[in-house]
């Protein structure tokens, strides 16, 4: 992992409403997705970039789901090799993974990357009629995070 294969730190902005279904509907907003569950794990700092794999494995174990049941995966690519590692270790088909570009191609705006990933996941489920998406990223010093979202579009 070097600066040559890392995502650029870029500017970015975005907004997303997050709330309970009841509060959203009360205010005339129809939810497009719901957060089902999430996990955070740690790996040795020397394995920075590996965190998404155990985070996704733990999330799947918690929810009782399997890779084939997930319609879309959005994995932040702070470094290009992270996505290749996740695909290889978990057997994620390329046609269900980071279809809209990631940190290397569109940039990595601090504080907005997670929102961009969530918006990609929600939009993919909405457009394809898929049910589940997993969003995942590695965090500094060997951490990994994964979140499962479910399509709520009618």
Sequence positions of predicted segments:
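Claisen-condensing/thiolase-fold acyl-transfer catalytic domains that form or cleave C-C bonds
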Residues: 1-154
């Amino acid at each position: 992992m070097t600066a040559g294969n890392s995502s650029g730190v870029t500017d970015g902005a975005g907004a997303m409403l997050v709330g309970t279904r009841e509060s959203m509907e009360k205010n005339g907003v129809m939810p497009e997705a719901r957060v089902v569950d999430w996990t955070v794990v740690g790996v040795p700092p020397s394995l920075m970039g590996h965190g998404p794999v155990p985070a996704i494995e733990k999330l799947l174990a918690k929810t009782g789901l399997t890779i084939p049941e997930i319609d879309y995966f959005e994995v932040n690519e702070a470094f290009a090799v992270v996505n290749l590692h996740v695909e290889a270790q978990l057997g994620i088909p390329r046609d269900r993974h980071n279809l809209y570009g990631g940190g290397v191609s569109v940039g990595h705006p601090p504080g907005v990357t997670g929102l961009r990933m969530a918006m990609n996941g929600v939009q993919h489920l909405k457009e394809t009629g898929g049910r589940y998406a997993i969003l995942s990223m590695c965090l500094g010093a060997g951490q990994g995070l994964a979140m499962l979202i479910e399509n709520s579009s009618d």
